[in-house]
């Protein structure tokens, strides 16, 4: 097993050296050239999928704290019905992951984004116009299905379309746009939450959730198809043309950068069975290095969920109430501050990841996160101490910042 891992590591190191030499010969487009701007626009269109996910978490967290929403549906901040409303979205995301496994290989990477965001728009409108709790929950289910389908494909598409030398930054930016959506929603709800007696206070944010999805639906088919999908479906010349247009500074179809990327695509496609058998997971566990990478990816996903970030996002107003903050306006304001802190952390992470490396950033951020969580536990361990509670809330912002850098 160790020999296989060593061989894989040597091959990866050799490939990195070849890529570094290729990038020295052809560094790609400048950021503000037309092709560079085109890459930015493609990325922003794809990142609408991430922004929608951020909007949803923040919108539900915010409206769950609004008296207008609670009285209309007869809900409480943390009752069983509230758990169903939050949980049904997660179930929808799980359902949406199944078409996300099939559609990208059958119809291309853009199709699941288009389909998923259409479903999301229907779900958002259904939730925003709901007059019964069941209708509202149904809208939440559709929103989750759309999100699960679109978001999964968006990440793989982005990693396959952006230049290799800035891939870490762009994928990090994808995660950062989650917090842009979160910040937009929480900032808006600070204002709408003050509309006493007006049902638009909670309905308007749900409508706004459909905006990024609508942008993606309108423009995603103006973006080029993934070169990996084109190659896997016998359209090798088109795959080379896309790589040359976006990754070569001279639009050279036989640039050393393009040649290396075509070799990588050919190698993975031949190993994975033409990239078409979505049910075949043997490529994930075929060799020791494959199992090592798969295990690492699974563990990062588990750690991301167990960090508590999702739970804190949804139930932050409840946690603030337990810390002694009862004002609806102050809860919404602190939720907005939480979103700003998250965005700052995500931007820092995306900016430094290509310089510090994935592993160093992961281990360093995890260590700091453990220390800060320990401090928060100590500060919030005593009931009735307002000073300790306020200090705990302050340190929780640092926890959010570091979690955003990490994940």
How should these model regions be labeled?
Residues 1-247, 270-407:
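Alpha-helical transmembrane bundle of multi-pass membrane proteins
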Residues 257-274:
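Cytosol/matrix-facing amphipathic helices and coiled-coil assembly/linker segments
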Residues 246-260:
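Short intracellular "coupling" helices and adjacent cytoplasmic loop segments at the cytosolic face
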């Amino acid at each position: 097993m160790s020999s296989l891992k060593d061989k894989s590591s040597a091959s990866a190191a050799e490939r990195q050296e070849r890529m570094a030499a290729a990038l020295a010969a052809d560094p790609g487009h400048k950021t503000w050239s037309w092709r560079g701007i085109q890459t930015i626009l493609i990325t922003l269109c794809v990142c609408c999928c991430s922004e929608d996910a951020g909007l949803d978490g923040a919108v539900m967290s915010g409206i769950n704290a609004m008296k207008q929403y609670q009285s209309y549906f007869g809900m409480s901040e943390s009752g069983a019905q509230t758990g169903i409303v939050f949980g049904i979205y997660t179930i929808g995301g799980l359902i949406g992951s199944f078409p996300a496994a099939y559609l990208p290989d059958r119809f291309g990477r853009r199709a699941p984004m288009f389909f998923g965001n259409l479903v999301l728009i229907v779900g958002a409108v259904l939730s925003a116009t709901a007059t019964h709790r069941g209708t509202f929950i149904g809208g939440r289910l559709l929103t989750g299905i759309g999100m699960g389908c679109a978001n999964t494909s968006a990440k793989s598409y982005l990693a396959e379309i952006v230049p290799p030398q800035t891939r870490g930054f762009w994928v990090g930016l994808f995660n950062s746009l989650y917090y842009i959506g979160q910040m937009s929603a929480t900032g808006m709800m600070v204002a709408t939450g003050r509309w006493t007696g007006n049902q638009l206070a909670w309905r308007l944010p749900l409508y706004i959730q459909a905006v990024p999805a609508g942008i993606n639906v309108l423009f995603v088919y103006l973006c080029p198809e993934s070169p990996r999908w084109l190659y896997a479906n016998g359209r090798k010349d088109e795959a080379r043309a896309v790589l040359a247009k976006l990754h070569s500074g001279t639009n050279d179809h036989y640039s050393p950068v393009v040649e290396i990327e075509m070799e990588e695509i050919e190698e993975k496609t031949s190993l994975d069975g033409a990239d078409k058998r979505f049910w075949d997971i043997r490529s994930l566990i075929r060799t020791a290095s494959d199992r090592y990478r798969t295990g690492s990816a699974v563990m990062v996903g588990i750690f991301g969920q167990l960090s508590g970030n999702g739970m804190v996002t949804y139930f932050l107003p409840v946690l603030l109430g337990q810390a002694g903050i009862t004002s609806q306006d102050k809860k919404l304001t602190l939720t907005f501050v939480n979103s700003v802190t998250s965005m700052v952390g995500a931007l820092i992470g995306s900016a430094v990841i290509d310089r510090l490396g994935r592993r160093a950033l992961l281990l360093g951020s995890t260590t700091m996160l453990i220390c800060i969580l320990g401090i928060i536990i100590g500060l919030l361990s005593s009931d009735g101490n307002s000073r300790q509670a306020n200090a705990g809330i302050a340190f929780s912002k640092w926890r959010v910042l570091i979690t955003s850098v990490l994940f």
